[in-house]
Amino acid sequence: MKLPEPMNTITNLIDQYHKAQSERPRPHMGCSALGHPCDRWLWLNFRWAVVEEFEGRILRLFRRGQNEEEIIVRDLRNVGIDIRSSQARVSFGSHVSGSLDGIIESGVPEAPTKRHVAEFKTHSKKSFDDMVKHGVEKSKPQHWVQMQVYCHGTDIDRALYVAVCKDDDRLHIERVRYDADVATRAVARGQRIALADRMPEPLSADPSWYQCRFCAAHSLCHKAAPTKQANCRTCAHSTALADSTWRCERHDADDIPVDFQHTGCDDHIIHPDLVPWPMIPSEDGHSVMWRIGDRVIENGANGYKSREILANPDVCGTDEVEEMKRIFPDAEVIG
């Protein structure tokens, strides 16, 4: 028997560890996302209908970016820049909020007494070179909008963008002027999308569009695939409210705890915009019927649970599964 390569084994273990530690999706509509070009993606992401799963190597890259923030702060302080309030928060209501990398009180050479919002990003060489050539507004519009929103939330009219090239440690530092119109429109857009009951139109109806091809929502958006996520936010009973809480109509419950939202309950009904099947509503509103192929499947507490249908819609309602459920009433479809 050939022994496993020890270095590969260790690498795999490290990557598995990071994957096991990966964070749950954020509960709010993050300011860092408001510059994303697609309304539908923002809605699906906020509704936890599409949850990106990253391999361990990518998660280690994210960690490197987070660790770089401490180094940047230390370098700025070493040259006399007074930076404070690391991870200060701004909130605009209707679920829109975010955390700043820092607030600079003074010391930026071009404006020594002026306050700045601080934003730090790491880049690949290709990304870094493009940004140096075109500037952050054109090259990284999502980062630029993020800074506009942070300026808006802190009443600071300048931002300092510090970019690091991960390949060769080059720095690109750029001062950004606050644009009130851009910021207010971005916040209003985020609030509108967060409070929308129905899924917005996509950026493009063309599945080969360059901004759609590699999107995590591509199969749901362009190939009529159902969501894979059963949680409170993908449930037809839930509503996002303007006070940044969620309400459950099925149980007449306000302010659903975030921890509970991740799993939900067995009364979950899949939001009709998140599946490709025709829906037949019930009179009491506690369940629905989905027409999947030549079968009509009940979804609700007295029928198939949402997690069963989403795990394998092709077997739900078949004679074999119905017989299995008759013999074992607690049996569930898991795949």
Where are these regions (language model features)?
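Metal-dependent nuclease catalytic cores that hydrolyze phosphodiester bonds in DNA/RNA
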Residues: 1-117, 124-126, 134-137, 283, ...
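A generic structural signal for residues located within well-ordered alpha-helices
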Residues: 68, 142-145
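Glutamine-centric residue-chemistry signal
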Residues: 87, 146-148
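A generic structural motif
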Residues: 105-107, 164, 249-251
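Internal, hydrophobic cores of structured domains that mediate oligomerization or house catalytic pockets
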Residues: 110-117, 121, 142, 151, ...
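A short beta-strand motif that forms part of the nucleic acid-binding face
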Residues: 122-124, 165-166, 252
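Metal-dependent nuclease catalytic regions and adjoining charged, substrate-binding loops involved
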Residues: 130, 137-142, 149, 153-247, ...
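Short linker/helix segments within small regulatory modules
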Residues: 253-259
